[in-house]
Amino acid sequence: MSKLTHIDDQGRARMVDVSEKPATAREAVAAGFVRMSAETLALAISGSGRKGDVRAVAELAGVMAAKKTSDLIPLCHPLALSKVEVAVEPADGGLSVTARVKTTGPTGVEMEALTAASVACLTIYDMLKAAEKGMVIEAVRLLEKTGGKSGDWKADQP
């Protein structure tokens, strides 16, 4: 098993020193899913929910969240993100969220992509909870990452 990079030899949490790492192109894609009834999905698609356009607001929330990742995850580095794209699309049984994040820097953007997808899912739940409290947020995961010392990685399909 690989050594955990955020734990020092004494078992204490630490922020990884990336000052000697070269700036390279990095990209990560994460996804999530909010399972809901057909009635709630129709409400989300129509854009006529009480709080407004669910998909547009969730996409914006995901973008904002990616930019705030280092404020939320204690050992994440603050990064200058060059692109954040969040898409919320209707799917069988709910809304599918995909977040794509890019940077050129010394560390990857996996956490930013995961944070964007997670917060977009939470925003969907918040905006539709008046219609259905039993929605389920599921399958939040990293789909792929490119760049960096560890190279490219892609998740096995579902």
From Swiss-Prot:
Pathway info: Cofactor biosynthesis; molybdopterin biosynthesis
Keywords: Lyase, Molybdenum cofactor biosynthesis
Domain of life: Bacteria
Pfam families on file: MoaC
Gene Ontology MF terms: cyclic pyranopterin monophosphate synthase activity
PANTHER family to which the protein is assigned, alphabetical: CYCLIC PYRANOPTERIN MONOPHOSPHATE SYNTHASE, MOLYBDOPTERIN COFACTOR SYNTHESIS PROTEIN A
Organism this protein belongs to: Caulobacter vibrioides (strain NA1000 / CB15N)
Name of the protein described by the UniProt record: Cyclic pyranopterin monophosphate synthase
EC number(s) from the headed UniProt entry: 4.6.1.17
Catalysis: reaction(s): (8S)-3',8-cyclo-7,8-dihydroguanosine 5'-triphosphate = cyclic pyranopterin phosphate + diphosphate
Family recorded in the similarity comment: Belongs to the MoaC family.
Its biological purpose: Catalyzes the conversion of (8S)-3',8-cyclo-7,8-dihydroguanosine 5'-triphosphate to cyclic pyranopterin monophosphate (cPMP).
GO BP term, example: Mo-molybdopterin cofactor biosynthetic process
Keyword Transmembrane helix: no
